[in-house]
Amino acid sequence: MYFALSVEIRREEGEFFSPIQGLYRRYELNYVFGDERDLIGVRTVMRPEDRVYMYRVNATPEQVQQLFRSIADRTNQLVEHPEFYHTLLNNCLNGILRHTVELTPEEVSWFDPQILLPGFSDRYAFNSGIIGQPGQTFEDLKEVSRIDERAEEVGIGDDFSKTIRGLPLTAVENQKVEE
């Protein structure tokens, strides 16, 4: 089982997200933790119209531990001092990016359109060296990192994490899938 994090708004009953309303302190910022099947499975299997990508972060085990501590500290900070979500300045992308800036020597320009507009965040991470391998193009990385089609094929089962990573199933696991 893998741990997953989603930075999002805390919606109240009957409340719907609006990017315009997100500019005006309408929503509280929320860190949601869960199993990959809960957080990623919803976006891949339950919303088949969404394209979902999973990128491996270029980090040492020590950096991963530091990243986890940073996320835990930030979560505790939000419990003590809640903040509002802001469509441009305190959103799902830059909430996570704040934790990854220590993985790259580059100075982060928080007003870069690739940071302000989440649809370009993967390119920013690639250009910063946070994701991708030497000699790999962004287009190639994006193609091999797309997971929604694999996830939709198998559904949200016990093998979900292996499937979205493209790992081969063992003979026993394959037999379970065929049954």
Where do the protein language model's features map onto the residues?
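Glycine-rich catalytic cores of cysteine/serine-nucleophile enzymes that process amide/ester linkages
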Residues: 1-52
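Soluble catalytic domains of enzymes that build or remodel membrane lipids, polysaccharides, and related
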Residues: 32-102
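Activation targets extended, charge/polar-rich intrinsically disordered C-terminal tails
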Residues: 72-179
